[in-house]
Amino acid sequence: MALLAIHSWRWAAAAVAFEKHKHSAVLTRALVSMCGSGPRWSSSQRGASGSARLSQTTESLRNTTQQRWGKDNSRQLLDATKALQTWPLIEKRTCWHGHAGGGLHTDPKEGLKDVDTRKIIKAMLSYVWPEDRPDLRARVAISLGFLGGAKAMNIVVPFMFKYAVDSLNQMSGNMLNLSDAPNTVATMATAVLIGYGVSRAGAAFFNEVRNAVFGKVAQNSIRRIAKNVFLHLHNLDLGFHLSRQTGALSKAIDRGTRGISFVLSALVFNLLPIVFEMMLVSSVLYYKCGAQFALVTLGTLGAYTAFTVAVTRWRTRFRIEMNKADNDAGNAAIDSLLNYETVKYFNNEKYEAQRYDGFLKTYETASLKSTSTLAMLNFGQNAIFSVGLTAIMVLASQGIVAGALTVGDLVMVNGLLFQLSLPLNFLGTVYRETRQALIDMNTLFTLLKVDTRIKDKVMAPPLQITPQTATVAFDNVHFEYIEGQKVLNGVSFEVPAGKKVAIVGGSGSGKSTIVRLLFRFYEPQKGSIYLAGQNLQDVSLESLRRAVGVVPQDAVLFHNTIYYNLLYGNINASPEEVYAVAKLAGLHDAILRMPHGYDTQVGERGLKLSGGEKQRVAIARAILKNPPVILYDEATSSLDSITEETILGAMRDVVKHRTSIFIAHRLSTVVDADEIIVLSQGKVAERGTHYGLLANSSSIYSEMWHTQSNRVQNQDSLGWDAKKESLSKEEERKKLQEEIVNSVKGCGNCSC
């Protein structure tokens, strides 16, 4: 045993230069297994640095080794542990999977430049007054006309009330004759009271008609903006989406569109009309009652507005905190529910609930601050308005005593101010919500201003390609996701039209990156990629992506029926074509066994289907797309061996006359490839056919092949050993049974 350990450690020391991070893990596992129990760390030691823990590990290994094997036999182990100390415990990644090395932004506009509020309003008004929609502009003009009529009727109402009070106050028989219906109607007081009612009804009528006419303008604007944002997000490059949480983006779009609706209503029907009505009331009071009334009114309104604006600005930060907490809570809930099975596997329901409750508590705290400060705002507004109204009433009373004003004038002044109080009470809410809506719209319009790094050249021609000309060529391609960490370092190869080429290599060697570059999710920093002899950067993205089909490693399906997900490969395909590709992918019979057949809902992200079924759906819809070039990114990774062989046979027929590139981990799936390209450290290390590469026993491919083959053989051997053990136990049981039977027979006494 000691000799075996010594040879193992000599081999490990000789392999220091080859993938250090892998061998460090191997050495650590070997040390722990040989030394009995591994090192135990206290809770404080777990938080220590990697180097500190490694030092503790090696010291523990020295002590344990000396105790168990003695100093002479542990020399090689000590040499190996010294080598371990010189290796970094955690190395920087040079590969890239998703957003490795960086967290997702929960704020959708994090790292983006804000858009000026004036530009937001200008952009929004361009949707309200579109040059290509004269019908919508006509609706806006009609709405403004009804708005003016409603405000005019509002001003008339207090005047009608004044004349009615003055008429009744004179108590003249000619002015008020209630002896019969005609005389009652004919009296001035009654006519004025009827006019009062008509004015109020007219104001309400104009307001409601205005809302009905303008409704189409507002909803059309919201729809167009939301559609443009949605389309723009789809046009952004993959790097943007990998750095943003989908839940946060969804909430940003939702809040932004709701904000547009509110701002449109607030600007057109609240803020501007309030200003207009304030000026109109002040002018009427100046003309009818004098400058003092106008000054008190303007002073009250000015103080009211200034107080509202100041307090609302201060309160806005609480709303921002609420939004952030709402975003975090929403993201946590979505993330947890999407990982429902993982939560169950680790019994972490309470942990997830506590985590979610933490975000809700933050939201609750900010919400309480917002509610309490709102009470302060409302009280301050009422106090200012009450002081102004009292001052106006005192002035009116003095005017009545002096004979300059009538009782009707006092009622008119009171009515005018109270009419202003309604929109003024709403002013605080309108201003607060408008500011919040502008914040939400800022996020929305900031997203619209984001420029994609992957775009067409001006007047880029479509890709000219046929299955006979679909050659793929990489020419000295250099690429890195993070500056200074090269993923591809001068990769060059060519895939002839109609040929099947496999790309293999270790994890992080750049296999999947080739798929992303060929689909133009990213651009290489150096070098060129050609398809059908045309540089990818010179042709339109739409034509390029129509010509390339991709079967991803992780197939994600839409929350819809199986038929919908299959049809997504070509939305114009007939049902017969959909059924044909399902049969080709070995999926048709499995679908027919489902309760609803092709109308079966697959669940969110396809969670109701098994991994193999999802993979077959992805393969089927890629076949339905019928592109000249197909990329398989470990497309059979989720399949069992029997299904894998069935699908591989089907795929051989599919790719027979088209260019195909297989990104493979299991080498057995690409044995029949016309050429196999082996990537190592971002470069093409080897290339050739399966048997040609195996002929070189020292090649990377040969080593990978034998490693995988030995693993399969070991699994088979373990299965055979278990079977033999089971058989030997059965034979032993039978032998024991025979001995018991024979002993009974030899005794001759049945009582035995």
UniProtKB/Swiss-Prot annotation:
<comment type="function">
    <text>Exports glutathione-coordinated iron-sulfur clusters such as [2Fe-2S]-(GS)4 cluster from the mitochondria to the cytosol in an ATP-dependent manner allowing the assembly of the cytosolic iron-sulfur (Fe/S) cluster-containing proteins and participates in iron homeostasis. Moreover, through a functional complex formed of ABCB7, FECH and ABCB10, also plays a role in the cellular iron homeostasis, mitochondrial function and heme biosynthesis. In cardiomyocytes, regulates cellular iron homeostasis and cellular reactive oxygen species (ROS) levels through its interaction with COX4I1.</text>
</comment>
<keyword id="KW-0496">Mitochondrion</keyword>
<feature type="modified residue" description="Phosphothreonine">
    <location>
        <position position="342"/>
    </location>
</feature>
<keyword id="KW-0472">Membrane</keyword>
<dbReference type="InterPro" id="IPR003593">
    <property type="entry name" value="AAA+_ATPase"/>
</dbReference>
<feature type="topological domain" description="Mitochondrial matrix">
    <location>
        <begin position="431"/>
        <end position="752"/>
    </location>
</feature>
<feature type="binding site">
    <location>
        <position position="428"/>
    </location>
    <ligand>
        <name>glutathione</name>
    </ligand>
</feature>
<dbReference type="InterPro" id="IPR039421">
    <property type="entry name" value="Type_1_exporter"/>
</dbReference>
<keyword id="KW-0812">Transmembrane</keyword>
<dbReference type="Pfam" id="PF00005">
    <property type="entry name" value="ABC_tran"/>
</dbReference>
<dbReference type="Pfam" id="PF00664">
    <property type="entry name" value="ABC_membrane"/>
</dbReference>
<feature type="modified residue" description="Phosphotyrosine">
    <location>
        <position position="340"/>
    </location>
</feature>
<dbReference type="GO" id="GO:0005739">
    <property type="term" value="C:mitochondrion"/>
</dbReference>
<feature type="transmembrane region" description="Helical">
    <location>
        <begin position="291"/>
        <end position="311"/>
    </location>
</feature>
<protein>
    <recommendedName>
        <fullName>Iron-sulfur clusters transporter ABCB7, mitochondrial</fullName>
    </recommendedName>
</protein>
<feature type="topological domain" description="Mitochondrial intermembrane">
    <location>
        <begin position="404"/>
        <end position="409"/>
    </location>
</feature>
<dbReference type="GO" id="GO:0070455">
    <property type="term" value="P:positive regulation of heme biosynthetic process"/>
</dbReference>
<dbReference type="GO" id="GO:0005524">
    <property type="term" value="F:ATP binding"/>
</dbReference>
<feature type="transmembrane region" description="Helical">
    <location>
        <begin position="186"/>
        <end position="206"/>
    </location>
</feature>
<feature type="topological domain" description="Mitochondrial matrix">
    <location>
        <begin position="207"/>
        <end position="259"/>
    </location>
</feature>
<feature type="modified residue" description="N6-acetyllysine">
    <location>
        <position position="350"/>
    </location>
</feature>
<feature type="topological domain" description="Mitochondrial matrix">
    <location>
        <begin position="23"/>
        <end position="140"/>
    </location>
</feature>
<feature type="binding site">
    <location>
        <begin position="505"/>
        <end position="516"/>
    </location>
    <ligand>
        <name>ATP</name>
    </ligand>
</feature>
<dbReference type="InterPro" id="IPR036640">
    <property type="entry name" value="ABC1_TM_sf"/>
</dbReference>
<dbReference type="GO" id="GO:0140466">
    <property type="term" value="P:iron-sulfur cluster export from the mitochondrion"/>
</dbReference>
<feature type="topological domain" description="Mitochondrial intermembrane">
    <location>
        <begin position="281"/>
        <end position="290"/>
    </location>
</feature>
<feature type="region of interest" description="Disordered">
    <location>
        <begin position="38"/>
        <end position="72"/>
    </location>
</feature>
<keyword id="KW-0597">Phosphoprotein</keyword>
<feature type="transmembrane region" description="Helical">
    <location>
        <begin position="141"/>
        <end position="161"/>
    </location>
</feature>
<dbReference type="InterPro" id="IPR011527">
    <property type="entry name" value="ABC1_TM_dom"/>
</dbReference>
<dbReference type="GO" id="GO:0140481">
    <property type="term" value="F:ABC-type iron-sulfur cluster transporter activity"/>
</dbReference>
<dbReference type="GO" id="GO:1903427">
    <property type="term" value="P:negative regulation of reactive oxygen species biosynthetic process"/>
</dbReference>
<keyword id="KW-1133">Transmembrane helix</keyword>
<feature type="transmembrane region" description="Helical">
    <location>
        <begin position="383"/>
        <end position="403"/>
    </location>
</feature>
<keyword id="KW-0547">Nucleotide-binding</keyword>
<dbReference type="GO" id="GO:0016887">
    <property type="term" value="F:ATP hydrolysis activity"/>
</dbReference>
<feature type="modified residue" description="N6-acetyllysine">
    <location>
        <position position="251"/>
    </location>
</feature>
<feature type="domain" description="ABC transmembrane type-1">
    <location>
        <begin position="140"/>
        <end position="436"/>
    </location>
</feature>
<feature type="transmembrane region" description="Helical">
    <location>
        <begin position="260"/>
        <end position="280"/>
    </location>
</feature>
<dbReference type="GO" id="GO:1903331">
    <property type="term" value="P:positive regulation of iron-sulfur cluster assembly"/>
</dbReference>
<feature type="compositionally biased region" description="Polar residues">
    <location>
        <begin position="56"/>
        <end position="68"/>
    </location>
</feature>
<feature type="modified residue" description="N6-acetyllysine">
    <location>
        <position position="216"/>
    </location>
</feature>
